[in-house]
Amino acid sequence: MTHEEQRIWLIKELQKDRSQLSHYRIPNDEQGQKDLLRGLMNIWMPKPISEEYLRIESEYLRAENEAKGITKISDLTPVEKDLYLWQGDITTLSCDAVVNAANAQLLGCFRVLHSCIDNCLHSAAGLSLRYRCFEIMSEQGHEEPTGQAKITPGYNLPSQYVLHTVGPIVSGRLTEEHCELLKSCYLSFLKLAEENGCESIAFCCISTGVFGFPQHKAAEIAVSTVKEYKKQQAAISR
């Protein structure tokens, strides 16, 4: 199959899961097709996936991700020793692990074409990521608590792992509890990363979007927590 044929095949396979969308016309333009495929992935309910689908999806998504351009840690300039500040698409970073700011269900974002990091990572990684999260949550039997972390493979992402953490929601005045919970997010995924042999981690701004955590304070907590952890644990180098 050509890249376009793979995209159309994937769309048709996912349309089979939604009877009301099975006769939805596939757009003729490339961007329209990409948006439809991503939208179908966004609303996909987790269930076992065929090997054929996974193979074609993997070939397609890896080509898409490579076309965006992969950024390696070695391409970046540290602001301090082994500490980097980078603005860009985290789905294009090649490192041991990237951090996902997840919600308590831990299944990814179901809002079609939403721009949150949860949606972007799941869309670039493929359906296997949602299914693995579903297995983890089914075994756990309850929502993911704030301040903890889970780890999954990165699947079709350039990074080996995804670390999922649920940040605190600030709906009113910022409290000390909010700050401690955010710090716990960083400590939890740093510890989990170390346990899985990760040396380089890329993390987004946790809780600073719709969760309402003040950005400046969140950045202070992130940097200070990482620095403190690195002093005690040398395994996480970057």
Pin down the residues of each PLM region:
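Macrodomain-like recognition of ADP-ribose-binding/processing modules
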Residues: M1-R238
